[in-house]
Amino acid sequence: MRVIVLGSGVIGVASAYYLARQGAEVTVLDRQSGPAEETSFGNAGQISPGYSTPWAAPGIPFKAVKWMFQHHAPLAINLDGSMWQLQWMAQMLKNCNPQSYAVNKERMMRVAEYSRDCLRELRKDTGIHYENRAKGTLQLFRKEAQMEAVQRDISVLEECGVSYELLNGNELGRVEPALANAQDKLVGGLHLPNDETGDCYLFTNALAQIAKELGVNFQFNQNVEKLIVEGDQIKGVQVNGKVLTADRYVLAFGSYSRDFLKPLDLQLPVYPVKGYSLTIPIVAPAFAPQSTVLDETYKIAITRFDQRIRVGGMAELSGFNLGLNEDRHATLQMVTQDLFPGGDMEQASFWTGLRPMTPDSTPIIGATRFKNLFLNTGHGTLGWTMACGSGKLISDIVLNHKTDISTDGLSIQRYSHAHAA
């Protein structure tokens, strides 16, 4: 079977790898010069199934209003003048209730836990290296109210069988020794020992090389213009004015998926939520993290690679604007210096990327009303966490194999206005 995968971020490359491993003849098309050159390039480096939590949560509307007036706020909304932005925010607000939160978190956890298992199996099979560590995630709380609020998430962790440890302020240094210097600023934390870390860019490029050895044909610097439709099937994809054909097609264009599918009348509710990161060389290892921490107050993750610290976070709704905002830069610097001042800020690199976010925070993985078009997009902040599981899942769906986990609620069908099958 011939399959064309559109997109060479971590989701597209993982999809191609698993398809090829199961015998498909795969071609990957991308406008960039290589794999992982956009959203997968500089993310926070966390592989954290336990923190697969919907942004659309009870209390978020109130918090969003409060953040509008807060310095170093984790969320910024810049109206871009489009009706689509307002519609997407309205859809998200509809999910900010306990019932929707529970449904969406279960779906996210299902994919994320499966994905971690797939990653471990892949690592065992291939020996792939990407500055990976398996030392867990530590969520940090600066306020007692945060410690109390986390009980809701702990109940879900228990239901899903996820190992965790709730720590008081004095116990944080046992997990992250460098936090002994910031103990007076923290009241406690939630430690998930089974989470992992790694450089998504290194992983994606290494996996692409492995996929090439399996026969995957990567074509970069391609202007992927449109899908050619005939009835209820895709007949080809127009690239640089020419039409390439396959038996089946997988769309993994991230934030650009929605606009690409507009001519097909598939209304994909994926909005680009802008995030930022710093990559900092380590000069004082004793003041650097061992694994990854998540500052609950500022919604910023600080992750250890081999000789670098990756600091990522923020959420900015401003359309496809890729400008670097110095206020966000200052926030990332402030949180890093506050907790782990072991890097050389003078040598730090500042980056931004667009996360493909759905209003319910759950990715869109599965079939469409077109018999041979499949979607693997909308992973939001969790593309790295969910990549391998999503790739394996979509490969099984495309090839009509039995899936390892339930696909309930993951396809575009959950959005009735999308005309999905």
Curated annotation (Swiss-Prot):
Catalytic activity, EC: 1.4.99.-
Keywords: FAD, Flavoprotein, Oxidoreductase
UniProt entry tagged with the keyword Hydrolase: no
InterPro entries named in the record: DadA, FAD-dep_OxRdtase, FAD/NAD-bd_sf
Record's catalysed reaction(s): a D-alpha-amino acid + A + H2O = a 2-oxocarboxylate + AH2 + NH4(+)
Cofactor(s) listed: FAD
Pathway involvement of the protein, from the record: Amino-acid degradation; D-alanine degradation; NH(3) and pyruvate from D-alanine: step 1/1
GO molecular function term, any single one: D-amino-acid dehydrogenase activity
UniProt: FAD binding residues: 3-17
One GO BP annotation of this record: D-alanine catabolic process
Keyword Oxidoreductase tagged: yes
Transmembrane segments: none
Cellular component, GO annotation: cytoplasm; plasma membrane
Record's function text: Oxidative deamination of D-amino acids.
NCBIfam families, A to Z: PRK00711.1
Family stated for the protein in its record: Belongs to the DadA oxidoreductase family.
Record HAMAP family: DadA (MF_01202)
Protein name: D-amino acid dehydrogenase
Species: Acinetobacter baumannii (strain SDF)
Lineage: Bacteria, Pseudomonadati, Pseudomonadota, Gammaproteobacteria, Moraxellales
Name of the gene this protein is made from: dadA
